[in-house]
Design a protein with these regions (language model features):
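Conserved Asp/Asn-Gly motif in the active-site loop of CheY-like receiver
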Residues: 33-37
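Active-site residues of response regulator receiver
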Residues: 54, 82
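Conserved acidic carboxylate
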Residues: 10
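Active-site beta3 strand of CheY-like receiver
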Residues: 46-52
Length: 128
């Protein structure tokens, strides 16, 4: 089996580096970008196994990426991360097709890793 490929779109350099290190140590191949436009460019080059998108980024936000890749037309899960615990944002993200939505201040890297692992297992089962 190939190494799972994760796309991380996060404009905060410190957080982006933390995610890259933790996921790399856990055996994932990582592509990291700083905004939604770069995320779309990377998705067009090579579809990720999972995309993790910050909600609020310059140039293009996570919602715009979700709108570009609705759940019915993509074969990879998308997780949205946000600094804000606004229920409306979470509802909009899920409505647009996010597979999960985490508030950064309420989440740990371990929780995010567990969610990614769960989504990868589900994806592999569907592909069999």
């Amino acid at each position: 089996m190939s190494i799972p490929n994760i796309l991380i779109a996060e404009d905060d350099a410190v957080l982006r580096e933390v995610y890259v290190k933790k996921f790399s140590i856990s055996g994932f191949s990582i592509r990291a970008v700083t905004n939604g436009q770069e995320a779309i460019e990377e998705i067009e080059k090579q579809k990720p196994d999972i995309a993790i998108l910050d909600l609020n980024m310059p140039v293009m936000d996570g919602f715009a990426v979700l709108e570009r890749y609705p759940r019915a037309s993509r074969n990879f899960p998308i997780i949205i991360l946000s600094n804000f615990g606004d229920t409306k944002n979470k509802e909009r993200g899920i409505t647009l097709g996010a597979d999960d939505f985490f508030i950064k201040s309420e989440m740990t890297i371990k929780t995010l890793l567990e969610k990614v692992t769960t989504l990868m297992k589900a994806k592999q089962m569907w592909q069999k």
